[in-house]
Amino acid sequence: MTFKSRDLSRRALLVAAIVLPTACSHTPPPAAATALPPIVFVHGNGDTAALWVSTIWRFESNRWPRNRLHAIDLPYPLARDDDAVEQPGRTSTTEHMQFLAAEVEKVLRNTGATQVVLVGNSRGGNAIRNYVANGSGAAKVSHAVLGGTPNHGVWADANVLPRN
């Protein structure tokens, strides 16, 4: 082997040592994080957004960006005894849906996404179903996951409630 060919081999080896690890590494492009849809978690009757902490941790541990995970807190999470009659500290089905719609709009605006995934528990699932079926949600929701959602709503029966 001549001096020139040995020098060329060293250069080729050096270049390969620098270029190959970079060329072979798999780094997702920055746009990959925005390709994941934002998820909005909706709690149930009488709950809070804290219900979703461990679920959000699970998504984060699977590399879902934290800025695409949103647990919302409903201002008055309890359902009214009678949906048509105002009751202090409680919301109607319509008010619940309107609050969810406003939160979805905020998430869409803040993330630049065109659709969200909604995940609901109990009464939160009712709000999601109502938003998709009767609100403006059909075009803004790509997927809905409803867990423990009562099919006929949340209601109270005065004959069943304990008397004080």
Residue ranges and their predicted role:
Residues 17, 55, 130-132:
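Hydrophobic residues on the short alpha-helix immediately C-terminal to a glycine-rich phosphate/catalytic loop
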Residues 40-43, 72, 76-90, 94-164:
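Serine-dependent carboxylesterase/thioesterase catalytic core
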Residues 7, 31-34, 110:
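Short, flexible hinge/linker loops that cap or flank conserved catalytic cores
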Residues 1-8, 12-23:
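N-terminal secretory signal peptides
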Residues 24-36:
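Bacterial Sec signal peptide processing site at the extreme N-terminus
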Residues 33-71:
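Short, surface-exposed "cap/lid" segments of acyl-processing enzymes
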